[in-house]
């Protein structure tokens, strides 16, 4: 399957800003919302957004719909520029898995070390869970990437009907889920996010970008209005994130409500798109976008371990307890808490951020499609196991109860996705283990190009160096 090739690369500032807004919102929410206390060897955890009336904040702070929207746009654009779907898939799968390897290596060692220093078992389990829980995104995004070439063809043929059908499937799943078949709800981990990902295709083609401000405001009103009606008269909770003790969550598993939320959020951002594009051209914002560009995936993966470090020292070591959310003391502590977490994250990025921009071999070709597909599915399975079980082995557990089997799956997936070593001879490429094929140039990319996808895009190496994003290649 050969992807169509496009004209020269140009930046889409809107997608850059959407990605930046998303990662800042994710990190800010995860750092600010925990309510922590420690007593009698037990770490108590709560959520500030569980405060009555604060659910409305989650309608804007739950930005995973924006991550999948931006990923859809970036994936379609980069797929069309790739020489073949094989080239595109091989690079994407390998690039998504590579930054996870150091996280797994570190967190296989951290729980035993904490126990060795005398940290009680329950806080160790909480730390291992928190460090791994966000891997759910990659467990869903990998299959999304694998399906992108097929979804791109479906988009070419049927256009808007594709996200409509996916949304309809999500609604049917919700009906079954709320009719005492709860496990079927996990099918929406694909239907919901694929529907939102597909909306990004329509932005990439220019349809959504051509909307005027009035039309975009109408889209936002329709999305948020539908969300409000479904919350008021349907089975859905008002909060767009999971709350401790809540019987139903809109996120685990995702509900069809997130599609209407995505429509509202995308419409809102499209309404201010000209202002966002102007903002991106200012020196400060431009510098921030360039700094964030090659670090999106690393920030996503390591911001929760940074929180674990700060909480371990402050809460377990110094006896700090989160003030009551909404009070002046709570507000006063936020800058100090965020600054401490940011300092730790900065150090972690210096240590492990290099894996996100590590170049792929320029003397080898991408793995065959079947290998990339198997690698993606294996990797998604391993990441899902880690997200569900965490990095800590239960007390008295066996090897089968530990994270080791899931880590092994992810490592095997990465090795399977590695590029096929090749020997260049007289314009022919001999691939070890595959058929002989003519060498093909990578159109629009210099030799040794390191561009990748993670939520998550890549900057043109000719513009700002090898910039890497967790939600696809934003180049247009």
Residue ranges and their predicted role:
Residues 1-2, 449:
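Intrinsically disordered, low-complexity segments
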Residues 2-428:
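Alpha-helical transmembrane segments and their immediate juxtamembrane cytosolic regions
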Residues 26, 299, 427-428, 448, ...:
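A composition/secondary-structure signal for short, hydrophobic, low-basic-content segments
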Residues 303, 445-446:
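N-terminal leader/targeting segments
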Residues 424-425, 437-438, 451-459, 466:
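Compositionally biased, low-complexity intrinsically disordered regions
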Residues 429-430, 442-443, 456-464, 471:
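Hydrophobic alpha-helical signal/anchor motif
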Residues 431-439, 448-449, 455, 473:
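Residues flanking N-terminal targeting/processing segments that define the start of mature chains
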């Amino acid at each position: 399957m050969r992807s169509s090739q496009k004209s020269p690369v140009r930046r889409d500032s809107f997608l850059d800003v959407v990605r930046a807004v998303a990662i800042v919102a994710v990190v800010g929410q995860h750092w600010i919302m925990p309510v922590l206390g420690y007593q009698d060897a037990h770490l108590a955890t709560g959520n500030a957004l569980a405060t009555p009336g604060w659910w409305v904040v989650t309608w804007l702070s739950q930005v995973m719909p924006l991550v999948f929207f931006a990923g859809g746009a970036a994936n379609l654009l980069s797929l069309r520029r790739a020489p073949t779907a094989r080239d595109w898939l091989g690079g994407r799968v390998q690039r998504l898995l590579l930054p996870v390897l150091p996280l797994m290596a570190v967190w296989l060692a951290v729980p035993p070390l904490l126990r060795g220093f005398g940290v009680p078992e329950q806080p160790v389990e909480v730390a291992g869970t928190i460090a791994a829980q966000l891997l759910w995104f990659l467990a869903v995004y990998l299959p999304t990437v694998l399906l992108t070439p097929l979804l791109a063809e479906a988009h070419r043929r049927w256009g808007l009907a594709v996200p409509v059908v996916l949304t309809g499937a999500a609604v049917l799943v919700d009906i079954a889920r709320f009719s005492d078949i709860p496990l079927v709800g996990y099918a929406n981990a694909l239907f919901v996010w694929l529907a939102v990902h597909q909306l990004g295709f329509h932005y990439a083609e220019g349809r959504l970008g051509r909307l005027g401000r009035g039309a975009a405001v109408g889209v936002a009103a329709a999305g948020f209005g539908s969300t409000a009606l479904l919350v008021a008269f349907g089975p859905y909770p008002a909060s767009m994130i999971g709350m401790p003790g809540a019987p139903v969550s809109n996120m685990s598993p995702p509900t069809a409500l997130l599609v209407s939320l995505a429509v509202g959020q995308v419409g809102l951002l499209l309404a201010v798109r000209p202002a966002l594009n102007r903002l991106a051209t200012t020196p400060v914002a431009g510098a921030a976008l360039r700094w964030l560009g090659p670090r999106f995936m690393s920030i996503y993966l390591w911001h929760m371990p940074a929180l674990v470090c700060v909480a371990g020292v402050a809460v377990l070591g110094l006896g700090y307890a989160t003030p009551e959310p909404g009070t002046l003391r709570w507000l006063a502590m936020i800058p100090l808490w965020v600054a401490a977490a940011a300092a730790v994250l900065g150090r972690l990025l210096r240590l492990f951020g290099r894996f996100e921009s590590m170049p792929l071999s320029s003397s080898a070709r991408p793995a065959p499609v079947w290998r990339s597909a198997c690698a993606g599915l294996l990797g998604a399975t391993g990441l899902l196991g880690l997200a569900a079980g965490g990095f800590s082995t239960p007390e008295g557990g066996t090897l089968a109860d530990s994270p080791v089997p899931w880590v092994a799956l992810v490592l095997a997936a990465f090795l399977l996705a590695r590029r096929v070593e090749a020997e260049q001879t007289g314009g022919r490429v001999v691939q070890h283990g595959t058929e002989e094929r003519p060498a093909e140039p990578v159109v629009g990319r210099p030799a040794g190009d390191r561009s990748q996808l993670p939520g998550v895009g890549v900057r043109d190496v000719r513009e700002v160096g090898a910039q890497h994003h967790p939600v696809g290649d934003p180049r247009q």
